[in-house]
Amino acid sequence: MKYLNLVFVLQLLISIKYASFGRAFSLFEDDTTFANLDKQLKLPQNTQQTLKLDRLNHDDPLFTTFISSMDKDYSLRLRTVDPSKLGIDTVKQWSGYMDYKDSKHFFYWFFESRNDPADDPIILWLNGGPGCSSFTGLLFELGPSSIGADMKPIHNPYSWNNNASMIFLEQPLGVGFSYGDEKVSSTKLAGKDAYIFLELFFEAFPHLRSNDFHIAGESYAGHYIPQIAHEIVVKNPERTFNLTSVMIGNGITDPLIQADYYEPMACGKGGYHPVLSSEECEKMSKAAGRCRRLNKLCYASKSSLPCIVATAYCDSALLEPYINTGLNVYDIRGPCEDNSTDGMCYTGLRYVDQYMNFPEVQETLGSDVHNYSGCDNDVFTGFLFTGDGSKPFQQYIAELLNHNIPVLIYAGDKDYICNWLGNHAWSNELEWINKRRYQRRMLRPWVSKETGEELGQVKNYGPFTFLRIYDAGHMVPYDQPEASLEMVNSWISGNRAFSDLSTLENAS
């Protein structure tokens, strides 16, 4: 999840014609004010932007094209990736695009399981941002290899494709190698595109339709995944593939509740010492109340404006004091690795960008564009100006649970921006049919079956599980690769409670 710079926040507020926070927030007593403000603001009616392409290869003979049986305007381009050329993994791989006419093109890279690809589960992985490529997950966190300083792949023995086949989809439109005439600037639209991609994928790989299928991701995927799951389960009951479960790591799903937990995390109540002064903590605590009121207006309104202002205020009041400490927003234990101020924070992410811009890499994968960037600021800004970041998506998690579809919310406990306290809180307050039974469960130790070490804390009732992972930041697989792999292997094997399977986990 990217964060706003305070200067940008102030520019945003100035752009909506109010000279100070005080003047802006005096308007929030009555939600009807927003109806008039929408007309005054001159907010972008279409924040989507055109992407300049370096080249097109729709007619590349190395691609096989599958036309959708649902809608002939959609197709899937597919090419085999020679494992020996890039050395990311020795397993079978495919890459390509989902195309909608000539206006939308979504890039993906698919790796078979290292174990039993015919029968092992399929996992779709999504990174966040909004606007960040899922190749961050592939080449920095949980994929078959990472990229070293010498631009050569480093084998990852803890890759999630040890026991599952992995799809890495670059979405929404405009991210990474994905491109189009217009860019998507809302989670709702992104969810529709992702669902259509999945239908096409399983048309191209029909032998995998009966396999377990999971959607996993982190950060802003806490928005994406609930929306995609809603598209699958509720809006498309005639789907041709299974949805077995979803997994969200350090996500932003219920911003109203999660915003209340920035001050506790920064001020020593999340298992780490305070990083702000008592005066700053008191000021942040007061600001949290105003943030809560703004988020409530966002939740209640059909207008984007209250959500835009809620994002601007909450980020400036609850993120900026922390950012000013110089600490990494993704890991409270220290500053960014290279003392960067651009939000990248990890040198390895720069290696991924450099690697993906090598002509031989792009040629092997069949990318239509040359200018790869791990995070796209235009996409991020587009989502900002629809207020998408402050909108709620936890209701779709409840929907899944009420359909008895398992949900795992996991969180590294050293992250600040989507911290474990906030994720634990919203999952505890979620309105679903077994809320009270879930609430009565207490966090208990999660102990490794491999080493006997306590890796974190877990809480489970029925299909719903919350998992705190010790000593991991925003990107759990990066900080705790062994624990991350044990987590995903346990989950996809059906051990939703992360316990001795002889334990009666669902007793009320």
Each predicted region: which residue ranges?
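Terminal and linker regions of secretory-pathway proteins
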Residues: K2-S508
